[in-house]
Amino acid sequence: KKICEIADNLEPRAYTSREFIKEIGKYLKTNSKKKGSLIETAYDKNVPIFCPAFTDSSAGFGLVMHQEKNPKKCITIDSIREFRELTEIKIKSKSSGLLMIGGGVPKNFVQDTVVCAELLGKKVDMHKYAIQITVADTRDGACSSSTLKEASSWGKVDVSKEQMVFAEATSVLPLIASD
């Protein structure tokens, strides 16, 4: 219901998930009883969060409620503009690396910025490194049906600096992130 409330108070137009998540952070900054969430902290530090499969989440239900209430004046999530925005970040970056938790749409989305940049006529380097934390297995079509080694065959990731971490993210990410 809070997602619906946030959306109800925005100008009706297409937003990227990054723009909408920033609005969630703004809302949390003023209204959250529990401070220091990831989204609020990202908002405070002006760190963008991209979620290319935003509608494939419980937050997506809030947007469905919002659109049901406001069929003619509603917001939408524009994943194509978001992909272009992320590709522009890749084009402007001197180098890039990936830390992916899980797989699916977000994994493909960020890896494909290299391919998209090239299709737009821009010369970009592969992602310098890639780490994927996942419990998925390619044998059953999970893991987006490919390991990072396959991504190197498409020119997305430098194969010499890729690492698959087959583990549950909540157990290993704190170890990776700690100092």
What is the predicted role of each segment?
Residues 52-97, 106:
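Active-site rim loops that border cofactor/substrate pockets in soluble metabolic enzymes
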Residues 1-59:
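Ligand-binding beta-strand-loop-alpha-helix segment within the catalytic cores
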Residues 60-63, 109-113, 142-144:
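A short acidic (Asp/Glu
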Residues 95, 105, 119-179:
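C-terminal functional extensions of proteins
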Residues 15, 19, 33, 37, ...:
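Conserved active-site and cofactor/substrate-binding residues in soluble primary-metabolism enzymes
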Residues 71-85, 116-135:
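Gly/Ser/Thr-rich active-site loops/lids in small-molecule metabolic enzymes
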